[in-house]
Amino acid sequence: MIRELCRGFGRYRRYLGRLRQNLRETQKFFRDIKCSHNHTCPSSPTSGGGAERGPAGDVAETGLQAGQLSCISFPPKEEKYLQQIVDCLPCILILGQDCNVKCQLLNLLLGVQVLPTTKLGSEESCKLRRLRFTYGTQTRVSLALPGQYELVHTLVAHQGNWETIPEEDLEVQENNEDAAHVLAELEVTMHHALLQEVDVVVAPCQGLRPTVDVLGDLVNDFLPVITYALHKDELSERDEQELQEIRKYFSFPVFFFKVPKLGSEITDSSTRRTESERSLLYRQLIDLGYLSSSHWNCGTPGQDTKAQSVLVEQSEKLRHLSTFSHQVLQTRLVDAAKALNLVHCHCLDIFINQAFDMQRDLQITPKRLEYTRKKENELYESLMNIANRKQEEMKDMIVETLNTMKEELLDDAANMEFKDVIVPENGEPVGTREIKCCIRQIQELIISRLNQAVANKLISSVDYLRESFVGTLERCLQSLEKSQDVSVHITSNYLKQILNAAYHVEVTFHSGSSVTRMLWEQIKQIIQRITWVSPPAITLEWKRKVAQEAIESLSASKLAKSICSQFRTRLNSSHEAFAASLRQLEAGHSGRLEKTEDLWLKVRKDHAPRLARLSLESRSLQDVLLHRKPKLGQELGRGQYGVVYLCDNWGGHFPCALKSVVPPDEKHWNDLALEFHYMRSLPKHERLVDLHGSVIDYNYGGGSSIAVLLIMERLHRDLYTGLKAGLTLETRLQIALDVVEGIRFLHSQGLVHRDIKLKNVLLDKQNRAKITDLGFCKPEAMMSGSIVGTPIHMAPELFTGKYDNSVDVYAFGILFWYICSGSVKLPEAFERCASKDHLWNNVRRGARPERLPVFDEECWQLMEACWDGDPLKRPLLGIVQPMLQGIMDRLCKSNSEQPNRGLDDST
């Protein structure tokens, strides 16, 4: 039992050390991110002076101010929780019905009679102090304040040799009034294997200090494995109250052990109670909520189940304490590893999402600026054409309007009611001031009607432009200016001025423009002509005559020319201001994009890989704690970066395949860690091989290297082996459909596989395909342009370092060639190549597989489209899939009716 306990606590310390190291590196990572962010971000505007700021300054200053990395931080709650776990070492805490039985259990655990087990006096008079047993090279006893200093006190044990600690040293003397002496614990150091791994604490007597207080002190510095020693057949009222208090304030499971009576022999297994004879103790513990009534909890818990309280009433089953302690310790470690891994994964997802955002920003911002410049020029030229073209139209329209509206205007003028002018009903003359007011109101009536017709004509053209392309232009500007302060959206304001030039003509036409002043001069001449020595009477005829004179004096050509001139002036002014502000905006974005690109590179090459490795370690720790290290079976195959073994059973999955990878350097570690994160983040899909978990083997190869063991679903064979063995046409086409479905799913998750080939397509026993080996799989935003993949399946643009997910379409085209050929023989164009370099050069120059006689025309066209040298001309997989389905329906149906002339079965 002692050996098993030592092994369990030693294992806990070992894994706790790894968790502590991972937490320390995680904290350092977040500190580095914070320092990097503080160094990158500009100072707050409030800290500087009132320097002049324009759009460029605002973009440069606020581009990273929102802080793409500011949200990457260690959540304080999780950090505190994890720090507390790694700081707490385990200890075995012994509670019990009385002090005698606690001492008995301690002696059983250590296998030596170190504490007296026969005490004089009752439990009520017992004053047993807290005892703490720790490891030391020599046996030594001392009094010390918990976690503080040792007290200078002469103990009975110091006066001579002893095998059992004297009772006087164990108890607090009644006449002792020294508070420190009362609180002090008796610290016993012993050279013992168990104490080398874990401290053992015996709780003080209940009368001296409540158990809840003792436990409360312990949990701040230790993880207690709680044992409760029993010697009676039932719990007393005091025992029940103590256990209720513990359950109320703490959630720790308890190992209840019934200590055999002194002098009695070990209970024979034949005398054990059956399930129907459950003890009173058991029923009491069920009532208290410690045990479950659903099963006979007799001290034989499963090795990997979550820790639960257990009652052991047979003394020979004390060995189950090792299983119980394993569960307690494992639960603690698994919960901590899971919490740490959640932090890692959450931040990694933020990194990847931000990498997408930054990549899109780098790609789309220059295009938006160019689009904005182009569309504004088109808008400006269109509006200038309107101004030039409309002058003659406006002149004709004014003449036509005056002719058609003349009678209506004269009638309206004759019948109009004047405002603020009292006109005598008997037709008596009025004063000169009233006459001028009446003439002005008639003039305003005519001008407003004419103005409305002109403005409507002009505005209809501008509205057409607004509806045609101005909306997109405005949205582009909003996205370019969104990082700026609302008050400095200068470029958008100038665009609005361009669009509103026609409306401004309408507003200023009768409120101060040169046209209005010209008309007012003409009206004054009319007044002079119709004003006699004595003021006239305001009659219907007089009003018609004033209106007639005003209409006849208007010059349609001058009016049209003035309107268009005013429109052009406003347009030119707004266009020039817009161009200047756009240049300023572009300069600001240029600085911001430079910083964004630097940050994007740092995320891809430093931050994300570093965090991914920590995530791999925390997840692997969780997996090894839950499922142990997998056992390697026979070797199934070897690849460029690892060996694949058979693994019969792991984590409830069987059979499994185990890929052992020994990363040779930091870069390969980072790539593997990111691959693992992408695979674990993917939802399960029937066309992708499941990844069950990972374990890091720190003693791989006899401790010479560290290996990552990836445990995944095991399938029947790969496509290469399947084609060699022979597959029917329908099976092969179904495999092609399965592969397309799998690639489409990866692309829908933002991932690019980059290594689609025969060996990376696995077949189950029904010959349905699943894609495996996501070693080169990455999100588009995280791709660095590295040249990866298998030469035969590599698209030409892979060699340039600038590529997207269409490289998987190219690779599928090559794969489809093999599927249609029904064999694994290399295409002639590739077989002639003497080396990889020779092959790559030929592919870049356009070398492709040849057409075989067995190929169906539609299949060949699909292959050619997929491996087109121009990525933009390759079909989307959403188009490829229905095409494949159509080919399969056509060929397989015809094949069932008559021999197929296009593709031969390879069986």
Swiss-Prot record:
Residue spans crossing the bilayer: none
GO biological process, one term: cellular response to fibroblast growth factor stimulus
Keyword Transferase: yes
Binding site for ATP: 636-644, 659
Pfam family, one: Pkinase
Reactions it catalyzes: L-seryl-[protein] + ATP = O-phospho-L-seryl-[protein] + ADP + H(+); L-threonyl-[protein] + ATP = O-phospho-L-threonyl-[protein] + ADP + H(+); L-tyrosyl-[protein] + ATP = O-phospho-L-tyrosyl-[protein] + ADP + H(+)
Residue span(s) of domain Protein kinase: 630-884
Annotated keywords: ATP-binding, Cell junction, Cell membrane, Coiled coil, Cytoplasm, Kinase, Membrane, Nucleotide-binding, Serine/threonine-protein kinase, Transferase, Tyrosine-protein kinase
Stretches assigned to coiled coil: 373-409
Active site as annotated: 755
Gene label: DSTYK
Cysteine disulfide links: none
Enzyme Commission number(s): 2.7.12.1
Name assigned to this protein: Dual serine/threonine and tyrosine protein kinase
InterPro entries: Dual_SerThr-Tyr_Kinase, Kinase-like_dom_sf, Prot_kinase_dom, Protein_kinase_ATP_BS, Ser/Thr_kinase_AS
Function: Acts as a positive regulator of ERK phosphorylation downstream of fibroblast growth factor-receptor activation. Involved in the regulation of both caspase-dependent apoptosis and caspase-independent cell death. In the skin, it plays a predominant role in suppressing caspase-dependent apoptosis in response to UV stress in a range of dermal cell types.
Compartments where located: Cytoplasm; Cell membrane; Apical cell membrane; Basolateral cell membrane
Family in the record: Belongs to the protein kinase superfamily. Ser/Thr protein kinase family.
One Gene Ontology term of the molecular function aspect: ATP binding
Annotated GO CC locations: anchoring junction; apical plasma membrane; basolateral plasma membrane; cytoplasm
